[in-house]
Amino acid sequence: QMCIRDSYYALRLINERFARTVRGVFLPLLRVQPRISSFPPEVKSFEEYSSGLDAFMSLTNSRIDELRGSMLTVLPPSFVSLCTSSRYGGKLEVNDASRTEFTATEEKIIEVINNGISQVLEQCWKDLTPISIKFQSREQNPQFAAFVESTDLVIVCSFVMQLPNIDSMSFDVAYPLQTLKPLSSLLRSRVQSDVVESNMTWRDKLEKAILEIPLLVKSNLSEPVVSMSKLLR
C-alpha cells in the first residue's frame, strides 16, 4: 500500500473538487447538506483492497471508453440504507442490521447515486481530459466483482461523508492503475495540475458567488374577485 499524493497530484485535485461537487447528488436524498472530504489516493493490489471490504457491498463496475479501462464505485449497505430511508421520509439514522441483499427500492437509490457520481466525475475530469463513464455491471460480493485480476494494482480514492448526529461514513472510487497509465504524465505534471486547480477555483468561486445572491420571492396565495357593489357595502 502506498500513498500517491505527489505522484498523482492532479488526481488529488480532481478528488477534492469531486468531494465539493458531489454533495449536490446526496442533498435531495438526505434532505441536508452533507460534508464530504477526500483522502489522498492510495495504490493497492485489488486482492488487498477487496479483502478489507465486507462480504456484502454495492459494487458498480463502469467503463471509461476514452481510457480503454474501467472504474469501480463501492458503497457500503449502511450508506445505501441511510440514503433510501431519508429519501422516503424516514429518520436520518444508520441501520446496522445484518443482511445479504438490497431491496428493490435500495437498488433504485444505488442507481441514482451511481449515475450522479458518474456525471460529477465527468465534469471534474474534463479540465484534464474528457471522459465518459458508462455502467457495465453491478455486484454485491467483492469476490464476484469482475473488475481486475487479484494481483493487479488499483488506485483507491476514498471519500468520507459527515452528517449531523450520526457516525461518518465513506465510499470509494477505484481505478485500475493500468487505466490511468496513459495519463500518468498529465496526472504528475504540476503545470497541468495548476491549470486544473485554477479552473476549479474559478468555478467554485463563481458557484459560491451565485448561491449567495439574495433573491426576492413573492407568492400570491389567492386573488379574490369582489364586485364593486359588495365592496361598497
Language-model features and meaning:
Residues 1, 5-233:
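N-terminal auxiliary interaction/assembly segments of multi-subunit proteins
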